[in-house]
């Protein structure tokens, strides 16, 4: 999983969207949704490209924000959105074991400690994972 987020970070860092207005994704990152609902809602609002830019062996699909979309999570800038739902045609399947039946999240610019502090203060049960210095994943999963 660390390899995935690092790859996403490097690939998308140069493709940051042009700012128009910020859309906060704090509520869905309280981990009360399915991977399908999270990704479908963002795609329907045209905030992410509905086709994944990358699929990891654990079936996590990475989606890019659309041009002009300024997505935030707990005050941190989002540069990648990830998700997966088992047996859902919206997602492509990797060649390994899926991470979970349903999973979703975002990759943000921010230190692990600051992101963890913001998530804890908000009462979210999301998992925080350091990808690289100042690049952190916020992740929700259901088995």
Task: Give the location of each predicted region.
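Long, charged/polar, surface-exposed segments that mediate recognition or autoinhibition
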Residues: 65-121
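Sec/Tat signal peptide C-region and signal peptidase I cleavage site
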Residues: 16-22
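C-terminal partner/receptor-binding element of secreted or periplasmic proteins
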Residues: 116-143
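N-terminal secretory signal peptides
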Residues: 23-81
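Short, ordered beta-strand-loop transition motifs
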Residues: 53-59, 95-101, 127-135
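Bacterial N-terminal signal peptides
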Residues: 7-15
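Positively charged n-region of N-terminal signal peptides that target proteins for export
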Residues: 1-4
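Short, extreme N-terminal segment that most often corresponds to the first beta-strand
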Residues: 23-31, 106-107, 136-143
């Amino acid at each position: 999983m660390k390899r995935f987020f690092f790859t996403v970070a490097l690939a998308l860092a140069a493709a940051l969207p042009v700012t128009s207005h910020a859309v906060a994704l704090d509520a869905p990152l309280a981990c009360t949704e399915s991977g399908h609902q999270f990704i479908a809602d963002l795609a329907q609002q045209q905030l992410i490209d509905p086709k994944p830019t990358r699929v990891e062996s654990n079936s996590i699909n990475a989606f890019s924000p659309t041009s002009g979309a300024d997505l935030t999570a707990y005050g941190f800038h989002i540069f990648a959105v990830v998700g997966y739902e088992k047996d859902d045609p919206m997602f492509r399947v990797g060649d390994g074991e899926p991470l979970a039946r349903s999973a979703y999240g975002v990759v943000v610019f921010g230190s692990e400690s600051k992101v963890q502090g913001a998530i804890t203060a908000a009462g979210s049960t999301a998992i925080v994972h350091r990808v690289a210095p100042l690049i952190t994943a916020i992740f929700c999963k259901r088995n």
